[in-house]
């Protein structure tokens, strides 16, 4: 992971993200879809997508770009690896299925 200097001033942290930060840091977020009811419009705006596109990414977390993962991590003031780990655990089955199809051809 890169060297991330998280902003420390209270004006650069949206209080709506405090619960999301706590949930990620405590390990209670195990799927990205768990964010669906936690400031979805605000997060969609942060990511520069509409609500429907954000909802689609929550259902298919492999569609989040590296930039979007890092942007969310900085906005939530967490290490981007935390989000990466959630996504990796969530998509491991899809990755294995795709690899199996590849080798069967």
Which residues fall in each region the model found?
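Short alpha-helical "recognition helix" segments of helix-turn-helix
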Residues: 39-44, 72
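Short C-terminal boundary/hinge segments that cap the last helix of small helical domains
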Residues: 77-97
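Key DNA-contact positions within bacterial/archaeal DNA-binding proteins
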Residues: 41, 52, 81
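DNA major-groove recognition helix of helix-turn-helix/homeodomain DNA-binding modules
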Residues: 4, 67-82
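A short, Lys/Arg-rich alpha-helix, primarily the initiator
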Residues: 2-38
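Short acidic DE-rich linear segments
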Residues: 2-3, 93-105
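Recognition helix of helix-turn-helix/homeodomain-like DNA-binding domains
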Residues: 47-64
